[in-house]
A protein has these predicted regions:
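Short, glycine-/small-residue-rich phosphate/pyrophosphate-handling segment
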Residues: 92, 105-148
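N-terminal beta1-alpha1-beta2 submodule of the flavodoxin-like/Rossmannoid cofactor-binding fold
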Residues: 1-82, 88-104, 146, 152, ...
Length: 174
């Protein structure tokens, strides 16, 4: 049994990336894994100020919910990053989360990672910039991270226009 953390960065409750997270979770639970989903919109996560204190203390001086989220990331075997794609990159919520991991990202080792991306664009190749920016964190900064799957929810503008079966199967095989 794996401990899976699904991070939904969507600012819209019930949006397409949220719905795909839920399908991934159904598959992962069917496979017997323990899954927790967090909605970044429900947490207070301030922007990184670049003060540099965390480089020596491994703690952020800001008083918000980021320490709780980092605990979950450190303890997870699998992390799923789900984001809508805005102007060909991840949304601000996910970027802020990634920026704020500096105090503890070296503790996030040997993680399996999945990406769920949703966009109005119909061409998955146009989302590669988004994937590369997330990989800049997961594969370049997290020791031993292994990319296990990417779901491109393309051509989805309105809520509900998503690739449900693919998300379920990705979770089932996590």
């Amino acid at each position: 049994m794996k401990n899976i953390l699904v991070i939904s960065a969507s600012p819209r409750k019930g949006g397409n990336s949220d719905v795909l997270c839920d399908e991934f979770i159904k598959g992962a639970q069917q496979a017997g894994h323990k899954v927790e989903k967090i909605f970044l919109r429900n947490f207070k996560v301030n922007y990184c100020t670049g003060c540099g204190v965390c480089n020596s203390t491994h703690k952020c001086v800001q008083k918000d919910d980021m320490a709780e989220i980092m605990d979950k990331m450190v303890n997870a075997d699998v992390i799923v990053f789900a984001t809508p794609v805005y102007f060909y990159t991840m949304d601000a919520q996910l970027k802020t989360l990634i920026d704020r991991t500096v105090p503890r990202y070296t503790e996030m080792v040997n993680k399996e990672v999945y990406y769920i991306l949703t966009a109005a664009d119909t061409n998955a190749a146009n989302l590669e910039k988004t994937v590369e920016s997330i990989r800049g964190f997961t594969l370049d900064c997290l020791d031993g991270a292994v990319e296990k799957g990417i779901l491109y929810g393309t051509g989805v503008w309105d809520k509900g226009e998503v690739h449900m079966k693919t998300a379920y199967e990705m979770g089932l095989h996590s």
